[in-house]
């Protein structure tokens, strides 16, 4: 059960980082 929780936290962290980078890079993409 603990493994499932740690996996969920890991995936959640990766998703947060992905969206943070995505929204940060969006203005540059739009300017192109």
UniProtKB/Swiss-Prot annotation:
SUPFAM superfamilies: Photosystem II reaction center protein T, PsbT. It is found in: Plastid, Chloroplast thylakoid membrane. GO terms for biological process: photosynthesis. Keywords: Chloroplast, Membrane, Photosynthesis, Photosystem II, Plastid, Thylakoid, Transmembrane, Transmembrane helix. The keyword Signal does not apply. One of its GO terms (cellular component) is photosystem II reaction center. Its main location: plastid. The chain crosses the membrane at residues 3-23. It is a single-pass membrane protein. Belongs to the PsbT family. PSII is composed of 1 copy each of membrane proteins PsbA, PsbB, PsbC, PsbD, PsbE, PsbF, PsbH, PsbI, PsbJ, PsbK, PsbL, PsbM, PsbT, PsbX, PsbY, PsbZ, Psb30/Ycf12, at least 3 peripheral proteins of the oxygen-evolving complex and a large number of cofactors. It forms dimeric complexes. Found at the monomer-monomer interface of the photosystem II (PS II) dimer, plays a role in assembly and dimerization of PSII. PSII is a light-driven water plastoquinone oxidoreductase, using light energy to abstract electrons from H(2)O, generating a proton gradient subsequently used for ATP formation. This is Photosystem II reaction center protein T.
